[in-house]
C-alpha cells in the first residue's frame, strides 16, 4: 500500500489500546471461551489495515477498533492479515480467525453472522484529469473501461448496475490504480476512503461526489456463536453511542469514512 494511504490510516487510528468499556473482571458467559483463550484473532484485508514501514506493525481504524474490542474482553489482540476479502472469509471458515469486519456478503453468510453496522464508506469513482465523466451514468457507456478490485463488495455492486461499460479487474487497490495511471482503464471504482488519497497521487484527478452504493461495515462472528454476536452488538452500539469512532475520524480529518447510525437502521 502506498505511503500516503498508510499515513491517512494511521492518522485516524484511535488511541492505542483505548477501551470502550472497562475490561472484564469476571468473564461474560457469552464470550467465556474467548476470554479463556487469552486472545481474539481478528482477520483484516487490504485496505482495512496498513503497515508502518518502520516497525512493520499493522495500523488503521479497523485495527484500533479491533484493539478496543480486545481491551473490552480483557485479552490480547492478534491481527490476521490478508490481501483480499475472500482470503479473510476463508480464515473465518477454517477457524483461523474469530472475527472479521465486512459488509453483508453472500460469500460469508453461510459461515458467519453479522453485527449491527459500525462503519459506512460510500462507493464512487475516480477519474483522471480531463475526463468528462461526472456520474456513474456517464461512466456506463460502451468503450469505457472501469478498473476495479476483483471480488470486492464495491465491484460486485457496480457489476449489478453496469449495462455498457467494461470492468477491468485487478487483485488489490494499488494494482487497480496502476491500471488507471497507465491508461489501461478510464475510471477507477472503489470506496471513497480508498479513492480520495489515491486522487492525491494523480494531479487533476477527481473523486465523483455521487455514489453508487455504500460499504456498510459490520463485525462478523462464526455461525452458531450467538453469545459472541450479542456481545459484539453491545460493543458496536457502545462505540457509536459514545461517539468514539466518529470523534476519532473527525479529529484526524479522515475523508470517506463515517460512523454508521445507531442500531441496524441501514436496512441492509
Give the residues covered by each predicted segment.
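Periplasmic-binding protein-like
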Residues: 46, 119-130, 192-237, 255-268
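Hydrophobic residues within well-ordered alpha-helices
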Residues: 69, 92-93, 139, 179-181, ...
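Short helix-initiation/N-cap motifs at beta->coil->alpha
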Residues: 78-90, 134, 168-182, 215
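Flexible hinge/capping segments at coil-to-helix
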Residues: 118, 127-145
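Ligand-binding clefts/hinges and TM-proximal coupling segments of bilobed small-molecule sensing domains
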Residues: 24-26, 153-170, 207-208, 237-268
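Extracytoplasmic small-molecule ligand-binding "clamshell" domains
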Residues: 23-103, 108, 169, 242, ...
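A ligand-binding cleft/hinge motif common to bilobed small-molecule-binding domains
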Residues: 86, 102-111, 181-213
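Ligand-binding cleft/hinge of the Venus flytrap
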Residues: 51-54, 63-76, 115, 140-142, ...
Amino acid at each position: 500500500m502506498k505511503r500516503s494511504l498508510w499515513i491517512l490510516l494511521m492518522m485516524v487510528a484511535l488511541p492505542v489500546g483505548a477501551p470502550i468499556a472497562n475490561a472484564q473482571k469476571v468473564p461474560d458467559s457469552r464470550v467465556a471461551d474467548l476470554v479463556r483463550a487469552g486472545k481474539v484473532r481478528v482477520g483484516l484485508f487490504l485496505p482495512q489495515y496498513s503497515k508502518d514501514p518502520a516497525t512493520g506493525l499493522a495500523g488503521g481504524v479497523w485495527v484500533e477498533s479491533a484493539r478496543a474490542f480486545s481491551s473490552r474482553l480483557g485479552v490480547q489482540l492478534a491481527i490476521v492479515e490478508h490481501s483480499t476479502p475472500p482470503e479473510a472469509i476463508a480464515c473465518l471458515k477454517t477457524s483461523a480467525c474469530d472475527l472479521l469486519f465486512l459488509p453483508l456478503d453472500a460469500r460469508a453468510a453461510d459461515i458467519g453472522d453479522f453485527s449491527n453496522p459500525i462503519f459506512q464508506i460510500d462507493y464512487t469513482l475516480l477519474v483522471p484529469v480531463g475526463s468528462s465523466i461526472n456520474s456513474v451514468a456517464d461512466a456506463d457507456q460502451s468503450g469505457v473501461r472501469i478498473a476495479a478490485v476483483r471480488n470486492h463488495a464495491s465491484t460486485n455492486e457496480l457489476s449489478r448496475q453496469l449495462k455498457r461499460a467494461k470492468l477491468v479487474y485487478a487483485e488489490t487497490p494499488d494494482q487497480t490504480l496502476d491500471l488507471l495511471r497507465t491508461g489501461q482503464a478510464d475510471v477507477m471504482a472503489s470506496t471513497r476512503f480508498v479513492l480520495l488519497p489515491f486522487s492525491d497521487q494523480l494531479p487533476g484527478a477527481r473523486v465523483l461526489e455521487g455514489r453508487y452504493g455504500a460499504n456498510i461495515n459490520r463485525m462478523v462472528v462464526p455461525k452458531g456463536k450467538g453469545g459472541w454476536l450479542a456481545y459484539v452488538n453491545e460493543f458496536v452500539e457502545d462505540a457509536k453511542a459514545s461517539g468514539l469512532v466518529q470523534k476519532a475520524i473527525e479529529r484526524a480529518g479522515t475523508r470517506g469514512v463515517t460512523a454508521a447510525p445507531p442500531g441496524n437502521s441501514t436496512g441492509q
